From Swiss-Prot:
Compartments (UniProt record): Cytoplasm
UniProt-recorded name of the protein: 6-phosphogluconate dehydrogenase, decarboxylating
InterPro entries: 6-PGluconate_DH-like_C_sf (IPR008927), 6PGD_dom2 (IPR013328), 6PGDH_C (IPR006114), 6PGdom_BS (IPR006184), Pgluconate_DH (IPR006183)
Presence of keyword NADP: yes
C-alpha cells in the first residue's frame, strides 16, 4: 500500500504521471504460483493469492484483450454521482477487509502445513514479515496478539479484534464490490475475498448438491447429516446397482 501511493503520485520527466505509460501486462517470478499450488495440495482455500496470480495471467493476454475490447460489450459508462469522499472510505474499508481475509487464508495454509510437518510453533512465522520483506507489515503485530490471546485460534476471523474489524468494514466492502460489478470494473481480489467471507460464515453451503452430482455420475457416495461418517450411494436413475461405504474419503 505504501509503495502504491508513491507510484500513483510519481511523475515522469515531462511532468505527467508515469503509471499510465506502463504496459499493463504483469510478469511474475513464481512465488504466487507456488503458494496457490501448495494451497491446492493441502486443500486450503487461499483464494486471494490464487486470483492475484490468475489476474496477472489475464493481464499477459494483452493482444487478445485489445481485440476483445472492440467486440465484447459491458455496462454503459456511468458517471459517478455519489459522494466521492464517502466512496473513497468505502474502498479503504474494502481493501482493509480483503487484506484481513488474505492474511487469514495465508495463516490457514501455515496451520495446515504445521499439522503436516509437525511444527510445534508458528510464532516466528507470524513475525518474520514485519521487516526486510516485500510484504513487511505492522499489521502482523495484530496477528501475533490474536494468537497470544488464543494459541489454539483456529481462524483469524474468530478473533475478537479481526471479527470486529471485518464487521465494521462489511457495509462499505459490499458497496464497493457492488459498484464495481455494476460498472463492469474487474475486482478479482475484492470479490473473491467477500465470497470467501460469506462462504466461511455460512453453516450450510450448496456443496451437498456437488456431492449428490458426484454420486449421480460417478457413484462417489455422500455422507448423511443424520449419520456422520456413514457414506451411501443412491440409484438416482433407477438403473444400475447400489454402493455403500463407511470409509470413502470424500
Amino acid at each position: 500500500i505504501e509503495i502504491t501511493a508513491n507510484i500513483l503520485k510519481f511523475q515522469d520527466a515531462d511532468g505527467k504521471h508515469l503509471l499510465p505509460k506502463i504496459r499493463d501486462s504483469a510478469g511474475q517470478k513464481g512465488t504466487g504460483k507456488w503458494t496457490a499450488i501448495s494451497a491446492l495440495e493441502y486443500g486450503v482455500p487461499v483464494t486471494l493469492i490464487g486470483e492475484a496470480v490468475f489476474a496477472r495471467c489475464l493481464s499477459s493476454l494483452k493482444d487478445e484483450r485489445v481485440q476483445a475490447s472492440k467486440k465484447l460489450k459491458g455496462p454503459q459508462k456511468i458517471q459517478f454521482s455519489g459522494d466521492k469522499k464517502s466512496f473513497l472510505e468505502d474502498i479503504r474499508k474494502a481493501l482493509y477487509a480483503s487484506k484481513i481475509i488474505s492474511y487469514t487464508q495465508g495463516f490457514m495454509l501455515l496451520r495446515q502445513a504445521a499439522a503436516e510437518f509437525g511444527w510445534s510453533s508458528t510464532t516466528e512465522h507470524r513475525l518474520m514479515w514485519r521487516g526486510g520483506c516485500i510484504i513487511r507489515s505492522v499489521f502482523l503485530g495484530k496477528i501475533k496478539d490474536a494468537f497470544d490471546r488464543n494459541p489454539g485460534l483456529q481462524n483469524l476471523l474468530l478473533d475478537d479484534f479481526f471479527k470486529s474489524a471485518v464487521e465494521d468494514c462489511q457495509d462499505s466492502w459490499r458497496r464497493a464490490v457492488s459498484t464495481g460489478v455494476q460498472t463492469g470494473i474487474p475486482m478479482p481480489c475484492f470479490t473473491t475475498a467477500l465470497s470467501f467471507y460469506d462462504g466461511y460464515r455460512h453453516e450450510m453451503l450448496p456443496a451437498n448438491l456437488i456431492q449428490a452430482q458426484r454420486d449421480y455420475f460417478g457413484a462417489h457416495t455422500y455422507e448423511l447429516l443424520a449419520k456422520p461418517g456413514h457414506f451411501v450411494h443412491t440409484n438416482w436413475t433407477g438403473h444400475g446397482g447400489s454402493v455403500s461405504s463407511s470409509s470413502y474419503n470424500a
